[in-house]
Amino acid sequence: MPFIINTDSDRAEMLAAAGAASFNDLIADIPEEIRLKKSLDLAPALDEMAVRRQLESLAARNRSTAGYVSFLGGGAYDQFIPSAIRAIVSRSEFYTAYTPYQAEVSQGTLQAIYEYQSLICRLYGMDVANASMYDGATALAEAALMAMNVTGKERIVVAGQLHPWNSSVLSTYLGAAGHSPVVQNSVEEGVGSIASLRGMVDGTVAAVIVQQPNFYGCLEDVEAIGAIAREAGALFIVSADPHSLGVLEAPGAYGADIAVGEGQPLGSAQSFGGPYLGIFTVREKFVRKIPGRLVGMTKDRDGRDGFILTLQTREQHIRREKATSNICTNQALNALQAAVYLSLLGRQGMQEVAGQSLERAHYLAARIVEIPGYSLRFSAPFFREFVLNTPVHPAVIVERMLEEGIFAGIDLSVFGDEGLLVSVTEKRTKEEMDRFALLLSSF
């Protein structure tokens, strides 16, 4: 929109309406010593073409997966996004800043969310999914709070290696609510020790949390962890990578009470870290305890199918002391992207994408461990991420690989850990992986 300056008559009219004789009269309450008494040192005005050129020059200094080969992971993945997704979600019926406070008026939006919920339930093998949460980390924290609400217990135990940032968000949520700190069992060969977990989980534990695959990319023994939780009367919470469910068993199949996840890989761009999508699913018996929005299907007075927001347990809708959550929105557009993604790929497509990631990750790992000085840090099975022991500090590799147009992975020393976390998605080609391995051999 072009900038149209206020005219003298415009300013006079506004001052008169404000009951001020002059601009100085209008700001009389601002102390003289803090008023700006000189012009701002601004660059000269530019025309539109010059502004565009300058902004494009600044943007070109960014490094993104559009111009680099990415082996970054740790919760945000360089997945292929079919062009049909952008075409569908960019339609004006969906792509809007409007929040449907009279939700039932927006039947199309509600149906889209309903379809998302249905698809997520099928993917995770669970009974009920909500309309979405902010991201995977907040979904996990809300799951822990829900478990405490359901069981009346205070303790949360983490089995295996949770993403450090998710762990931090979890601790922030629980600490702010006055709950006990989270405790974690020991990690051996990349996965949680079942023996140490068994000694930590008792009748005082509200929930046992596991990330599958875990932060290191390794596969936890979810069957054993779930059994320990059930024996102690604790809820079993699984934070699952949605893409892994193309080849791994769904959380519902091995007894998860609550299953959450980060939905970014389902059609959302990495986009500087957000907005992302929090997946939240539960068993049917917990439906009245689920946080956030829930879309249901009903009949109108003429017998036609319709969609509504149902079981609204947010504090905006019911008494605060009765509310299950104070989440004030959801990620509807990202949820729509996930629904379109899942619909386009279908069961077979999800299996193919997950299978390609699995095969390529193991191909690359096998290539790298042949290079002197490199080895896998853990012997546990992995899906599409693995941790490397390296002959030089991972930070050196990461920095030098940038010069070659490659994001080499995550230097785990930023988390106080050791090794280089490498992720492989279906986008990586054999040529890219072979070149990466060749460059690693130069260190």
Swiss-Prot record:
Q: Which CDD domains does the entry mention?
A: GDC-P (cd00613)
Q: Which UniProt keywords apply?
A: Oxidoreductase
Identify the InterPro entries for this entry.
GcvPA, GDC-P_N, GDC_P, PyrdxlP-dep_Trfase, PyrdxlP-dep_Trfase_major, PyrdxlP-dep_Trfase_small
Protein purpose: The glycine cleavage system catalyzes the degradation of glycine. The P protein binds the alpha-amino group of glycine through its pyridoxal phosphate cofactor; CO(2) is released and the remaining methylamine moiety is then transferred to the lipoamide cofactor of the H protein.
Q: Which GO terms describe its molecular function?
A: glycine dehydrogenase (decarboxylating) activity
Q: What is the organism lineage in this UniProt record? A: Bacteria, Pseudomonadati, Chlorobiota, Chlorobiia, Chlorobiales
Query: Per the record, what are the reactions this protein catalyses?
Result: N(6)-[(R)-lipoyl]-L-lysyl-[glycine-cleavage complex H protein] + glycine + H(+) = N(6)-[(R)-S(8)-aminomethyldihydrolipoyl]-L-lysyl-[glycine-cleavage complex H protein] + CO2
PANTHER family referenced in this protein's UniProt entry, alphabetically: GLYCINE CLEAVAGE SYSTEM P-PROTEIN, GLYCINE DEHYDROGENASE (DECARBOXYLATING)
Q: Spell out the protein name for this chain.
A: Probable glycine dehydrogenase (decarboxylating) subunit 1
Q: GO annotations under biological process?
A: glycine decarboxylation via glycine cleavage system; nucleoside metabolic process
The species this protein belongs to is Chlorobium phaeovibrioides (strain DSM 265 / 1930) (Prosthecochloris vibrioformis (strain DSM 265))
Entry-linked Pfam families: GDC-P
Whether Oxidoreductase counts among this entry's keywords is: yes
Enzyme Commission identifier(s): 1.4.4.2
Family per similarity comment? Belongs to the GcvP family. N-terminal subunit subfamily.
Its quaternary structure? The glycine cleavage system is composed of four proteins: P, T, L and H. In this organism, the P 'protein' is a heterodimer of two subunits.
Q: What class of enzyme is it?
A: oxidoreductase
Q: Which gene name belongs to this protein? A: gcvPA
